[in-house]
Amino acid sequence: VAFHVVGGGLAGLSAAVALASAPGGHDVVLHEAAPRAGGRCRSWHDTELDVEIDNGTHALLGANPQALAYLARIGAEDRVHWLDGGIEFLDLRDGARWSIRGPADMLRPWRHGGSGAAREMALLLRLLVPGQGAAVPPGLAGATGLGRLAWDPLVRSIMNTAPGIAAAVPFAAALRRILRGGARGMRVGLARRSLADCLVDPALHLLARHGARLRLGARLREVRGGADGAPPVLHFDGEAVELARHDRAILALPPWDLARCAPGLAPDCAASPIVNLHAVLDMPDTGAGDIAFRGLVGGQVEWVLRRGRVASSTTSAAEALSGLSRAELHARLWPDMARALGLPPGARALRWRTIVERRATPVQDASFEACRPGIATAAANVLLAGDWVVPGLPCTIEAAIASGVAAADAALRSARTARE
């Protein structure tokens, strides 16, 4: 039995790891179009900055059971730095500072009562059990009360879609899990060195130990067959892989890439961008263990992560910024980053660059949520994985890993049935 996983992002990596680790030993091949694995969680040595950077400031939460299980499976638990003091926030409008360590801190504004607090409580209660097709109420992202505390960056970072547009069902699922987890569920975990060092390289080492094959630069061009009993054929550059009756393929690709090579398997969905600013600071290199993380409200930047002298910012649902030039982006983002880092007015970075991930996720509105396909396809030996696949979960690291594990489990079960 051969298992072909197409796509080396976290969905594909988690699927390949689950397949390679399963009892009995299996022939697992991971095909990735890029020169490195990792997808949107990749890391690389940037020649402009002369340092290693990540493709964004991705973070884990204590309320991410699938991600935590993945870390344990690949032996990377010690590569995560957990913030013990909660999430620090800064309001760029008036300099107010606060931290959120658990659900009680998120509810702090309501202790003071008033009509605004009562309105926000009603909105939150309605959000926790939303109707199908509902959007996250924009009132939770206002300039006062709970909206000021955390909701706007929380909605945008989880959904990469603005409040008022973001589908309420997946956001509510993530929110319920966070609230149920208490203070432990809200702990933030950050890669100590890089996303690749934490989430990608240990998985590749596990796959190599189990004899799995990694094919980099292997772009899937087309999927033929699979209907009316015809065997599916995966067409890569210069190679075609025909799936035998008991073989299985997991297509762990973004929806726009899947739509290109296998029309009909992915919904037609708009993309939502994320903008990052990376900067090398004028300070001594204090090493990978020196990590700071802060949320911002009232500005252009939502999150700032600093590892040693390398700082990175994230702005989600960044349609308004994605068309700007590098210089314009720097002019908008650097002042926010500098304030978050406590730098003096007029401070400059030694080197900087901006990165616009134009297709970071789909726009996660109600119409997208309604057409997510799930992992099964019409062909018994072709399955799907990806953060966008499974209904009811936001497009996050947790969803990507969960979909990969679910697809691997389904592939193992169906392959076993086909052999019997």
Report the location of each language-model feature.
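Helical element adjacent to the flavin cofactor pocket in flavoenzyme catalytic cores
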Residues: 176-236
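Conserved Rossmann-like nucleotide-cofactor binding loop
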Residues: 11, 36, 256
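Glycine-rich FAD pyrophosphate-binding loop
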Residues: 20-47
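Conserved flavin/dinucleotide-binding core of flavoenzymes
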Residues: 43-45, 101-104, 303-420
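Glycine-rich active-site loop/strand segments that organize a redox cofactor
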Residues: 39-63, 177
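N-terminal Rossmann-like FAD-binding beta1-loop-alpha1 element of flavoenzymes
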Residues: 2-30
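Mid-domain catalytic core of redox enzymes
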Residues: 218-342, 355
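Mobile amphipathic helical/loop "lid" adjacent to a hydrophobic cofactor/ligand pocket
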Residues: 64-176, 180-181, 185-186
